[in-house]
């Protein structure tokens, strides 16, 4: 086989359709653009929301105000009234709450003070409301806050890239 024998695979190369070159070509006169209206002309087309002069739906809708805070932390809540099923004197960790099916491990958990706590429990959570903390301690238990660490992703540096502080970069005066 020589270089001049090489050919593309059948169906791999399609010839360009020459439009606007006579009615016998199948794409003559209007060149596949239909009747000659505004959409058939060259240049910018009307915006997708344009409805022919009728009041468009995008103008009928009220304006969206405000913004969505991308740093908002959404807590899963557990009321202390739900914790009466746990045996007295237990140390309730976040892993045990996940195992019970009360929370999802991907989001932080906050303990709220709705209901009555009749058990002495040591509870680990990311946050406690003031009333929940008071009721847990009144029942003889302890409320221990564990920090919520967000694992940030970076394509180049993997999970949790190091944060650079400006203080570390400034040279110390001698």
Swiss-Prot record:
Question: Which GO terms are recorded in the biological process aspect for this UniProt protein?
Answer: translation
What GO cellular component term, any one, is given?
A: cytosolic large ribosomal subunit
The record's InterPro entries line, in alphabetical order, gives:
Ribosomal_uL15, Ribosomal_uL15/eL18, Ribosomal_uL15/eL18_sf, Ribosomal_uL15_bac-type, Ribosomal_uL15_CS
- Protein name from the UniProt record: Large ribosomal subunit protein uL15
The record's NCBIfam families line, in alphabetical order, gives:
rplO_bact
Role noted for this protein = Binds to the 23S rRNA.
Q: Extract the SUPFAM superfamilies matched here.
A: Ribosomal proteins L15p and L18e (SSF52080)
Q: Do the record's keywords include tRNA-binding?
A: no
PANTHER family reported for this sequence: 50S RIBOSOMAL PROTEIN L15 (PTHR12934), LARGE RIBOSOMAL SUBUNIT PROTEIN UL15M (PTHR12934:SF11)
Query: Gly residues compositional bias: what residue ranges?
Result: 21-35
Region ranges (Disordered): 1-57, 147-174
**One MF term from GO for this chain?**
structural constituent of ribosome
Q: Which domain of life is it from?
A: Bacteria
PROSITE patterns assigned to the protein according to its UniProt record, in alphabetical order = RIBOSOMAL_L15
User: What are the alphabetically sorted keywords of the record?
Assistant: Ribonucleoprotein, Ribosomal protein, RNA-binding, rRNA-binding
Species of origin reads Roseiflexus sp. (strain RS-1)
HAMAP family for the chain: Ribosomal_uL15
Q: Which family does it belong to?
A: Belongs to the universal ribosomal protein uL15 family.
One Pfam assignment:
Ribosomal_L27A
Outline the subunit composition.
Answer: Part of the 50S ribosomal subunit.
């Amino acid at each position: 086989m020589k270089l001049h024998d090489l050919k593309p695979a059948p169906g791999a190369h399609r010839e360009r359709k020459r439009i606007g070159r006579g009615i016998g070509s199948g794409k003559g006169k209007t060149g596949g653009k239909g009747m000659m209206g505004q959409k058939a002309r060259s240049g910018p087309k009307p915006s997708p929301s344009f409805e022919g002069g009728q009041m468009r739906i995008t103008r009928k809708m009220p304006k969206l105000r405000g913004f969505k805070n991308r740093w908002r932390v959404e807590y899963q809540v557990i009321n202390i009234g739900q914790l009466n099923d746990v045996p007295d004197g237990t140390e309730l960790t976040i892993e045990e709450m996940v195992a019970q099916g009360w929370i999802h491990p991907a989001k932080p958990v906050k303990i709220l003070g709705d209901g009555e706590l009749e058990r002495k429990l040591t509870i680990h959570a990311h946050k406690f409301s003031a009333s929940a903390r008071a009721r847990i301690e009144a029942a003889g238990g302890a409320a221990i806050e564990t920090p919520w660490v967000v694992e940030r992703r970076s394509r180049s540096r993997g999970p949790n890239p190091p944060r650079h502080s400006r203080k570390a970069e400034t040279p110390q005066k001698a």
